[in-house]
Structure formats: structure tokens, C-alpha cells
Amino acid sequence: MNDDKTERPVKTANQRGAARLAAVQALYQMDVGGTGVLEIVAEYEAHRLGQEIDGETYLKADAAWFRSIVSGVVRDQVRLDPLIAAALQDDWALSRLDSTVRAILRAGVFEITDRKDVPVAVIVTEYVEIAQAFFDDDEPKLVNAVLDRIAKQVRGEPKK
């Protein structure tokens, strides 16, 4: 048995997952607090990604992936929101969703539409897991259904 306490490097996939979570948190903060994209990206890169805050250590994240998601969602929100609204049930408006759910959906839809190099299954699974970190049952199911509908529409493929 090895008692060596050396820190293992975080795998790239895990760094992307951490970047996705941080992007959702940043998008939420922007939505609720009205913070600008440049300010929020600078704050996260300087003080959160891989840093310790109040005794909690944030996972090391792929900073470029984080920037890509946050800036892409902000840049393309007028294109992303109608896709999300169309994928929601008839009686649900995007504005009616919780801010965290909106942030998760916007980030997930951005990746589905703009990151063709990432399989749909990876994107949907990662964002459903993020939803499960914040919510119990209905919201993760909603995230799964909406992202799956949009993936079929945009890429012609469901998650596998």
C-alpha cells in the first residue's frame, strides 16, 4: 500500500467538468447580480478556479474552457434562448425557470451548438450532473429533456 500523499494531476476531462460547473456559477452570478462578463471571468480566474475560499478548495478547472462557455453564452444568448424556449413545454417560459436552471441550460445549449468536437452524451451527462448538485428530481429531468431535444434538433442525434 502506498501512503504517498503527492497530489495527482487532475485529468483534462475533470478540468472541463470543473470549468462547466464554474461557468454555470458565473452565469448565475451574472444573471442575479448583474455582473459583467469581463469582471466575472477575471474574478473566477484570479480567485476561484483551483483556489481555496473559506476553507473550500475549488477544483482545478480548464480556464480556457470556462472562458469559452461564459463568453460564448453571453455573446450568443439571443440565439440560445429561443432554442431553449422552443424546447420547453408550452406552459413554461424561460423567464419562469430558476436562474440556476437557466444558467445550466444556456451553458449546455452553447456547447451542443458550438462544441461539435464534444459528444452530445458527454455534454448532457455533465449538465444533468450539475443540475443534480443543486436540485433533487424535477430540474435534472428538465435539463436532460431540454438538452436532448435541442441536440436532436441541432445535431440530429440524441444522447447515447
Curated annotation (Swiss-Prot):
Swiss-Prot/TrEMBL GO biological process terms: DNA-templated transcription termination; transcription antitermination
Please verify whether the record's keywords include Zinc-finger.
Answer: no
Name the InterPro entries for this protein. Answer: NusB-like_sf (IPR035926), NusB_fam (IPR011605), NusB_RsmB_TIM44 (IPR006027)
Name one molecular function that GO assigns to this entry. RNA binding
Q: Name one GO cellular component term.
A: cytosol
Q: Which UniProt keywords apply?
A: RNA-binding, Transcription, Transcription antitermination, Transcription regulation
Query: What family does the database annotate?
Result: Belongs to the NusB family.
Query: What function is annotated for this protein?
Result: Involved in transcription antitermination. Required for transcription of ribosomal RNA (rRNA) genes. Binds specifically to the boxA antiterminator sequence of the ribosomal RNA (rrn) operons.
Q: Matching NCBIfam families, A to Z?
A: nusB (TIGR01951)
User: What's the protein here called?
Assistant: Transcription antitermination protein NusB
What gene is this protein translated from? nusB
